[in-house]
Curated annotation (Swiss-Prot):
This is Glutamate-1-semialdehyde 2,1-aminomutase, chloroplastic. Signal peptide: none annotated. GO terms for biological process: chlorophyll biosynthetic process; protoporphyrinogen IX biosynthetic process. Pathway: Porphyrin-containing compound metabolism; protoporphyrin-IX biosynthesis; 5-aminolevulinate from L-glutamyl-tRNA(Glu): step 2/2; Porphyrin-containing compound metabolism; chlorophyll biosynthesis. Its EC number is 5.4.3.8. One of its GO terms (cellular component) is chloroplast. Belongs to the class-III pyridoxal-phosphate-dependent aminotransferase family. HemL subfamily. Residues 18-40 are annotated as: Disordered.
Length: 481
């Protein structure tokens, strides 16, 4: 029986009649063998202590200072500016396997993975070779190509809810399209989202959102008119009764419920065992659609995503990150009768200049092929559980209040007593302490997401040695702070 790993987190992975929900403070441990076909990784060239002696960010500081004169805040996505953790943002020069190298020559074990896409490891040789071949034919066609058919077939065969799929260029685009589609299909205006869940930066979703909005402590965003969010209803994650109340209050008006089946943009927050099944039941009873935002969890928790892992099939699904293998991509798909409303098959308009880009399709195809290999998810399962439990054990040993957990290649931890059920719980975390921990780990050659409110990721390229080094560094830093 698979279980979510971590202190305060333990329950079965499938929702079946014969299983009893488990929720407590006892850690659970995985029992599986690592894959023998992990990607090659760059080896550390110095010990942790040696690295710290030579650690400098002088070149990154100089480059970032110039960047702030050229781009708002010096970055093209807010969390990269390190505002929530403090210190100097690192400027990356190259990546390979489980490692990143900055322009100062510092090397890091990477647990961000480009925010999720790098599940087979950075700059995989097979993917790079395939991209080189595709590039010989051109970088953008603006017309149909066979690669779109291939990736579409792979996605449809993998994801339980998807009978037809539309490729776009980002997770935000996917969520924008699926929202419009849900409203068009149901002829209803309102949607329910959950506090702390992030579905991109489109206006209707910037209400009690997670990700960068949570990181910066913003309740919403200036420039979003009330008219854009008047039909967006919110509820606390894992709160079934709140959703029932919203449907009762807005009878016949709610088009869909959209959620992250595992929250990753308010930190790592898994669903209670009964939560997803209850939301599926409520939406069916009210003729509303259920949308899983699997931009983060798709192909990460299982080859068929969180919906395969938990055994709950939504009506519509959004994807991104992994299906582009590190190139810009997004997708939304679902039941055929719903998807046939999308233009040109139907009247709901959505388009994109670079949608179905041949390079993104190529990277996605070869990434998914690698994920079909034997032992893929067992490897992710094992190393991620060992990483998370190792960090939590180090926290306990050094006297810090910490909680967290993992599912397959996704994990997170909070500097707070657990369990964490929703965004309100997550906000009790000691973010100042997380910042000190983060900066200490960076000096030790470990790169986590620069925010307490972001999940972490492992890859097929991560090795037992990576995990051991990370846990040892964590214990050292936790003693110091």
């Amino acid at each position: 029986m698979a279980a979510v790993n971590g202190v305060g987190l333990s329950w079965p992975s499938k929702l079946t009649k014969n299983q009893t929900p488990k929720w407590g403070f006892s850690p659970s441990h995985r029992r599986c063998n690592p894959s023998s076909s992990s990607s090659a990784t760059i080896r550390m060239t110095a010990s942790v202590d040696e690295k710290k002696k030579t650690f400098t960010l002088e070149k990154s500081e100089e480059a970032f200072s110039k960047a702030k004169e050229l781009m708002p805040g010096g970055v093209n996505s807010p969390v990269r500016a390190f505002k929530s953790v403090g210190g100097q943002p690192i400027i990356i020069d190259s990546v390979k396997g489980s490692r990143m190298r900055d322009i100062d020559g510092n090397e890091y074990i990477d647990y961000v993975g480009s925010w999720g896409p790098a599940i087979i490891g950075h700059a995989d040789d097979e993917v790079l070779a395939a991209l080189a071949e595709t590039m010989k034919k051109g970088t953008s066609f603006g017309a149909p190509c066979l690669l779109e058919n291939t990736l579409a077939e792979m996605v449809i065969s993998a994801v339980p809810s998807i009978e037809m799929v539309r490729f776009v260029n980002s997770g935000t685009e996917a969520c924008m399209g699926v929202l419009r589609l849900a409203r068009a299909f149901t002829c209803r205006p309102k949607i329910i989202k959950f506090e702390g869940c992030y579905h991109g930066h489109a206006d209707p979703f910037l209400v009690k959102a997670g990700s960068g909005v949570a990181t910066l402590g913003l309740p919403d965003s200036p420039g979003v008119p009330k008219a854009a969010t008047i039909d967006t209803l919110t509820a606390p994650y894992n709160d079934i009764s709140a959703v029932e109340s919203l449907f009762e209050e807005h009878k016949g008006e709610i088009a869909a419920v959209i959620l992250e089946p595992v929250v990753g943009n308010a930190g790592f927050i898994p669903p209670k065992l009964e939560f997803l099944a209850a939301i599926r039941k409520i939406t069916k009873e009210n003729d509303a659609l259920l949308i899983f935002d699997e931009v983060m969890t798709g192909f990460r928790l299982a080859y068929g995503g969180a919906q395969e892992y938990f055994g709950i099939t939504p009506d519509l699904t959004t994807l991104g990150k992994i299906i582009g293998g590190g190139l810009p991509v997004g997708a939304y798909g679902g039941r055929r009768d719903i998807m046939e409303m999308v233009a040109p098959a139907g009247p709901m308009y959505q388009a994109g200049t670079l949608s179905g880009n041949p390079l993104a399709m190529t990277a996605g195809i070869h990434t998914l092929k690698r994920l079909q290999g034997q032992g893929t998810y067992e490897h992710l399962d094992k190393i991620t559980a060992e990483l998370t439990q190792g960090i939590l054990d180090a926290g306990k040993k050094t006297g810090h209040a910490m909680c967290g957990g993992s599912i397959r290649g996704m994990f997170g931890f909070f500097f707070a007593d657990g369990p964490i059920y929703n965004f309100s719980d997550a906000k009790k975390s000691d973010t100042e302490k997380f910042g000190r921990f983060y900066r200490g780990m960076l000096e030790e050659g470990v790169y986590f997401a620069p925010s307490q409110f972001e999940a972490g990721f492992t890859s097929l390229a991560h090795t037992p040695e990576d995990i051991q080094r990370t846990v040892a560094a964590a214990e050292k830093v936790l003693k110091q702070i």
